């Protein structure tokens, strides 16, 4: 499992770290990653990040921790 904790980042910095993590996860063949955003400003933006991300299939909040998301990564296309 790959986990990304975005606590302590600004929204812009958090987006860059998130985007790099999803791209890395795609190319490494991960099925999903956990992204911790907390309950602040980033949590308001996070679902839009996932919708716009070409490497993400879907994202779901963890029931036990609403500040964390399970991000399902798209399957890697052969040769890419």
Residues of each region from the PLM?
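N-terminal targeting/trafficking signals and adjacent low-complexity tails
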Residues: 1-80
